A protein has these predicted regions:
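Long, low-complexity, charged/polar intrinsically disordered regions in eukaryotic proteins
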Residues: 1-13
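Conserved segment of winged-helix/HTH DNA-binding domains
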Residues: 36, 78-105
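Short, hydrophobic-biased segments on the C-terminal half of alpha helices
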Residues: 60-61
Length: 105
């Protein structure tokens, strides 16, 4: 009996990681707000995401590591260039899936 596991598919691993990152309701609300197109500071995102600024800072680090958001001048956060929303916002094309961010988590 061969018990060796097949090598994991790299895109499947990325999707699994993204699913883990996006599973958090605060991160979902942050992405939904950023999908509207504005670059925002942590304190504004904290209010919009109904969380504290220190917690949102930690969430932003996770989203940055996943490549979903970028930080610019003045520590303003926005969606990473590859994930800019379509006109009207609330929709992000991640390549292997499209997120509709117009729903509450």
């Amino acid at each position: 009996m061969n018990t060796a596991a097949a090598a994991p598919n790299p895109s499947a691993l990325k999707l699994k990681h993204l699913a883990t990152v996006l599973h958090d309701p605060v991160r979902w609300r942050i992405l939904r707000e950023l999908s509207k197109g504005d670059a925002l500071p942590v304190w504004v995102l904290a209010g919009l995401a109904r969380s504290s600024a220190p917690k949102v800072s930690k969430h932003m680090a996770v989203l940055r590591k996943a490549g979903l958001v970028a930080v610019g001048y003045g520590r303003l956060y926005k969606l990473a260039p590859g994930f800019q929303p379509e006109a009207g916002g609330a929709r992000l094309d991640l390549g292997h899936c499209v997120l509709k961010l117009d729903t509450e988590f």
